[in-house]
């Protein structure tokens, strides 16, 4: 076994997103007010803070104002919203809504880059005395199981090794990752976090909760002078997503940069659904194309989004553990916002943790104060009002829109009647090829390299880099299932749902004879969206962090 360095801190935040950074800052604010000192650390798998920061984003500054009362926050935000519009896209045109629903009114909000916001928050965290370490991927949780596995306590995180060859051997530059121990570990890894997934499964934190369901957001930044005024916000429904949950956005980050994207729900029925292709068709729509034509696409990215709502949130505390942000499902699908909720979750966790440290008791019973703070907060009020939003779309786009309207009128009740609509795992809604009708098969876009692009070209614009001599960080537990069953039953949907051309199935299956061929995994293309871990119908794909500092570089995203 390699000799590992060890470092002990009071509180360790995993993930350099808005939830972790806000939580770390709040913790140091409380320590300063109490004239005490805390060792607080934030680790991030990206090469720099902000490299993996990806969102729409229109930011509600509510949590920022709470975190920095009376301070200037413009450094973390870019452009005030100047106008709002809602378009319903038909196949050949658009219908502009006569008004924007109050829940989507963005007056006082900001069009912003999450990458830039997290860089600004990281600088504020370091000013407050937080140690921020990028290129430190949390590879596995450290446990103290001395009281029995059912009550195992999280005591730290092991950082991923560097210099491991593809066959698992150690290269000349091998460097074992250190063990970081802490009185409390806070998981803010984003959606479908690797350590969060492990903790939820081992500790049963999702017991009695609805399944979490996700969508994938795909977006590009375009340099297009003079098409939209800075601060313009447009949201769209309808084409091309007639049979799938989702919608689009167009945000003017400045007078010459447009942020455009499309969300596709990861609970679709057709296994040949391709979210990246959906986005290409979106850009070809007659209402969208004129906004981009003649411009230059300058950045690309993709990320999963937790859409399950209040009833799908796991218990977000345990012995020595808190879960924050997207990892805990703090996102309002109805408002299309989550950054302010992520920050608030980190701040509430920090307040509960500080009290626990002062009492020298970081047990689950003490950290349950985080749950109570949430129950008493505006975050819970907001999420309660949107608790049935995504579930309503299980009956189609029109059912979803009717449910959304009735929910708004009845405090969030499903279709105005039910307090709680049932949820289900997205991958379980996928149908087999034999259940599809020919009319459901969609013709793919042939990319022109100007307005529409293939996946590999888009990946280049994400800045993604991985050392190809390391082991693949996408683990398929049984490729025989891919060859013998998935080829026939689902047509290997990994080749479609991945927005980065990571998976290339090369299988031939004839009758009862064993399948021939292999699954090629182009892990160097991976943009860390987690779609494969979420949507694989057999749940045999596990995403784990690659070597520290690798992955996309979401500058300005």
State the predicted function of each range.
Residues 11-41:
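N-terminal Rossmann-like FAD-binding beta1-loop-alpha1 element of flavoenzymes
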Residues 19, 48, 192:
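Conserved Rossmann-like nucleotide-cofactor binding loop
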Residues 36, 120, 124-290, 348:
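Predominantly flavin-linked oxidoreductase catalytic cores and closely associated redox partners
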Residues 37, 45-92:
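N-terminal FAD cofactor-binding segment of flavoenzymes
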Residues 303-333, 458-469, 482-497, 504:
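FAD-binding beta-loop-beta segment adjacent to the flavin cofactor pocket
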Residues 329-335, 347, 351-397, 515, ...:
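Active-site-proximal substrate-binding core of FAD-dependent oxidoreductases
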Residues 393-450:
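C-terminal auxiliary extensions adjacent to catalytic cores
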Residues 488-524, 531-552:
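Iron-sulfur cluster-binding cysteine motifs and their immediate structural context
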């Amino acid at each position: 076994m390699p000799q590992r360095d060890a470092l002990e801190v009071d509180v360790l935040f995993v993930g350099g997103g808005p939830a972790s950074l806000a939580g770390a800052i709040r913790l140091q604010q409380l320590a300063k007010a109490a004239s005490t000192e805390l060792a607080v650390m934030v680790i991030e798998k990206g090469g720099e803070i902000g490299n993996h920061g990806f969102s729409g984003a229109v930011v509600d500054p509510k949590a920022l104002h709470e975190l920095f009362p009376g301070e200037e926050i413009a450094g973390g935000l870019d452009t005030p919203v100047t106008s709002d519009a809602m378009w319903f896209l038909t196949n050949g045109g658009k219908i502009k809504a006569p008004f924007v629903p109050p829940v989507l009114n963005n007056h006082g909000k900001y069009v912003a880059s999450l990458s830039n916001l997290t860089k600004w928050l990281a600088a504020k965290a370091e000013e407050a005395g937080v140690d921020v370490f990028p290129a430190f991927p949390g590879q596995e949780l450290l446990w103290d199981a001395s009281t029995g596995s059912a009550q195992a306590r999280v005591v730290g995180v092991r950082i991923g090794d560097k210099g491991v060859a593809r066959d698992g051997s150690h290269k000349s530059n091998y460097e074992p990752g250190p063990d970081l121990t802490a009185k409390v570990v806070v998981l803010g890894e984003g959606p479908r976090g690797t350590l969060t997934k492990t903790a939820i499964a081992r500790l049963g934190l999702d017991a009695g909760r609805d399944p979490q369901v996700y969508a994938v957001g795909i977006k590009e930044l375009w340099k297009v002078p003079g098409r939209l005024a800075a601060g313009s916000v447009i949201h769209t429904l309808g084409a091309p997503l007639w049979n799938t949950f989702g919608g689009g956005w167009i945000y003017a980050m400045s007078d010459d940069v447009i942020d455009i994207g499309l969300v596709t729900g990861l609970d679709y029925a057709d296994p040949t659904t391709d979210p990246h292709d959906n986005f290409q068709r979106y850009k070809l729509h007659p209402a969208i194309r004129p906004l981009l034509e003649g411009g230059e696409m300058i950045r690309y990215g993709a990320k999963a989004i937790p859409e399950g709502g209040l009833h799908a949130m796991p218990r977000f505390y345990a012995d020595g553990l808190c879960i924050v942000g997207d990892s805990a499902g703090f996102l309002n699908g109805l408002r299309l916002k989550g950054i302010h909720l992520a920050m608030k979750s980190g701040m509430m966790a920090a307040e509960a943790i500080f009290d626990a440290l002062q009492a020298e008791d970081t047990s689950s019973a003490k950290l349950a104060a985080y749950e109570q703070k949430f129950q008493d907060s505006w975050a819970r009020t907001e999420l309660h009002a949107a608790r049935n939003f995504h579930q309503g779309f299980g009956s189609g786009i029109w059912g979803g829109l009717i449910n959304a309207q009735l929910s708004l009128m009845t405090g969030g009740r499903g279709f105005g009647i039910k307090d709680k609509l049932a949820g289900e795992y997205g991958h379980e809604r996928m149908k087999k090829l034999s259940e599809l009708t020919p009319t459901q098969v969609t013709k793919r876009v042939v990319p022109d390299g100007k307005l529409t692009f293939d996946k590999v070209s888009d990946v280049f614009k994400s800045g993604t880099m991985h050392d190809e001599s390391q082991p693949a960080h996408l683990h398929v537990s049984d490729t025989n299932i891919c060859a013998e069953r998935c080829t026939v039953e689902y047509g290997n949907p990994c080749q479609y749902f991945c927005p980065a051309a990571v998976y290339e199935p090369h299988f031939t299956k004839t009758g009862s004879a064993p399948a021939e061929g292999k699954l090629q995994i182009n892990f160097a293309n991976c943009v860390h969206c987690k779609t494969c871990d979420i949507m694989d119908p057999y749940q045999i794909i596990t995403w784990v962090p690659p070597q520290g500092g690798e992955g996309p570089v979401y500058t300005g995203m």
